């Protein structure tokens, strides 16, 4: 079985996501053939960002990684599994699904990440290695993680950038900015 045999990319919408994103007014595509990556400023307004931050602050827990690598400092951030029943979370999820065209049943629960001064998530991928220890746990039923959608909720005084090693592109935090990239190559 091939890596994505259990996910019908033609019916999931994931194969058309780049085309849909490219048609969104104001969206910018990274000028590289190495990665399908898009950025949209102002995706969320200040009130929505503040409401999500309040939920994250209330329900935060230490972040984890799917496939432990023995490096305790690999990911030092905190995480919140946002309540999928919350009206604000529902509205944001609906906007994300409308934007990408990927049906909701192929999406993962929304999480919020918090990075305090000095915290980080070292270089990693958002897709799962089919030969890794985490493949059966995370991909046997739902399939490979095809697209990642990330929204910055605030602008720290310093730090907070997301760097893509494959392209050399670094994105600075800007409240409400959406980053979307394809993990399947």
Predicted features by range, described:
Residues 1-180, 184-185:
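Fe(II)/2-oxoglutarate oxygenase catalytic core
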């Amino acid at each position: 079985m091939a890596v994505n045999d259990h996910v019908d990319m033609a019916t999931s919408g994931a194969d058309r996501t780049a085309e849909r994103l490219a048609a969104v007014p104001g969206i910018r595509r990274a000028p590289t053939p190495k990665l399908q990556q898009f950025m949209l400023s102002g995706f969320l307004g200040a009130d929505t960002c503040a409401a999500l931050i309040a939920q994250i602050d209330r329900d935060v827990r230490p972040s984890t990684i799917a496939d432990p690598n023995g490096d305790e400092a690999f990911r030092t951030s905190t995480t919140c599994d946002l309540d999928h029943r919350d009206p604000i979370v529902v509205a944001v999820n609906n906007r994300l699904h409308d934007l990408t065209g990927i049906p909701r049943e192929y999406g993962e629960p929304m999480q919020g990440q918090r990075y305090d001064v000095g915290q980080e998530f070292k270089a990693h991928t958002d897709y799962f290695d089919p030969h890794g220890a985490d493949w059966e746990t995370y991909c046997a039923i739902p399939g490979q993680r095809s697209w990642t959608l990330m929204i910055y909720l605030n602008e720290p005084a310093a730090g907070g950038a997301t760097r893509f090693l494959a392209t050399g592109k670094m994105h600075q935090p800007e409240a409400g900015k959406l980053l979307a990239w394809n993990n399947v190559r």
